Each structure stands twice: as structure tokens, then as C-alpha cells.
Regions:
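Glycine-rich, N-terminal phosphate-binding loop of Rossmann-like dinucleotide-binding domains
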Residues: 99, 108, 123, 172-173
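A short helix-loop-beta submotif of the ANL/AMP-binding
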Residues: 134-140
């Protein structure tokens, strides 16, 4: 039987474990306040639903979008970065629309990582930061992130200790 080496390298999915614990507690009748996956707990606002319904009726929208996302959306993204962070970005080469953050990070990892490339990832972290680079055949190096450790010192130390130098550093806030 063939092995699936990339899948076997994946750590347990912590959000799946938390969900199982939550479901078990609810089955026992416990009252759970869920601070988990960020699923909405309120309905989508009516004006958004109305606009989506309106857009779904336009025949021009009955096709696949361009692969990088609609230009006006990419322009809005780069304008937002300029307004909020005073960063100039080119909507044609430095902005892309993805289905969501997980998909974007996973595809980024596949695009920039070669087998054996090392990647610095904070721990704890959002699971996709680890999963994406393992699935891209990279080597994940965990950098401690806690009140007891200066993260940037730990990051610099991890960078200096590894050769060849890590190709990617995940910085998330």
C-alpha cells in the first residue's frame, strides 16, 4: 500500500479536536460559548443578501471570474492598503482575490516553496500556517510565541540556527 507522506507529516488538526470536545460537551447538555472558527452567529445583513441576489441575476456573472479576481476588487484592496497602512501596491501584480485566507495561504505556499525549503512559523499559530507548508513539502520550524519569550529574538535565533536559511517567515497579527 502506498503511503501519503505529506498527509502523514501533518499534525493533528487542533480546531477539529476542539470541535469534537465542544460537540461532546453539548451532547452531555453543557452550555457552551463558542469562540471557535469564527462562524457567524447572526444572519447576513439584508442589504448584502439583496445585492448578492441582484448580482446573481446578471448573465455577465454566470461565468468564472478572472483568476486574479476582478480588477475593481483588486484596486479596492490596494486602495484600502494605501489608506490604512500607507503602502503602495500594484493591483495588477501585488493583489489577488482568493476564496478565503486558507485557500490563499495554501496556494501561496505551493507557489513559493520547493521540497526541503524551511519555513519559520510561530507556535501557537493558525493551523493553515503549518499545514500549507507541509503540504508544499517544506520543513516547518516552530518559533515560540509566548509572554515569556521575545518573539523577534526567537525568530532571529531560529533564522540564524538554520542552514540553508529559511525561505519564509510567517508573521501574523
Amino acid at each position: 500500500m502506498r503511503e501519503f507522506s505529506r498527509i502523514e507529516r501533518l499534525p493533528p488538526y487542533v480546531l477539529g479536536i476542539v470541535n469534537e470536545l465542544k460537540y461532546d460537551a453539548r451532547r452531555r447538555g453543557e452550555d457552551i460559548i463558542d469562540f471557535g472558527l469564527g462562524n457567524p452567529d447572526m444572519p447576513t445583513p439584508k442589504h448584502i443578501v439583496d445585492k448578492l441576489m441582484e448580482a446573481s441575476q446578471k448573465e455577465a456573472n454566470h461565468r468564472y471570474s478572472v483568476s486574479k479576481g476582478i480588477y475593481k476588487l483588486r484596486l479596492a484592496i490596494t486602495d484600502w492598503y494605501k489608506r490604512n497602512h500607507d503602502v503602495d501596491l500594484d493591483p495588477n501584480s501585488e493583489a489577488i482575490a482568493t476564496i478565503g485566507s486558507k485557500e490563499g495561504i495554501a496556494h501561496l505556499a505551493l507557489a513559493i516553496t520547493s521540497p526541503g525549503d524551511s519555513v519559520l512559523v510561530p507556535t501557537p499559530t493558525y493551523p493553515i500556517h503549518t499545514y500549507a507548508f507541509i503540504l508544499a513539502n517544506g520543513d516547518v520550524i516552530h518559533v515560540p510565541l509566548s509572554a515569556d519569550v521575545d518573539f523577534f529574538d526567537a525568530l532571529l535565533d531560529a533564522f540564524k540556527r538554520n542552514w540553508p536559511r529559511p525561505k519564509v517567515m510567517i508573521i501574523n497579527f
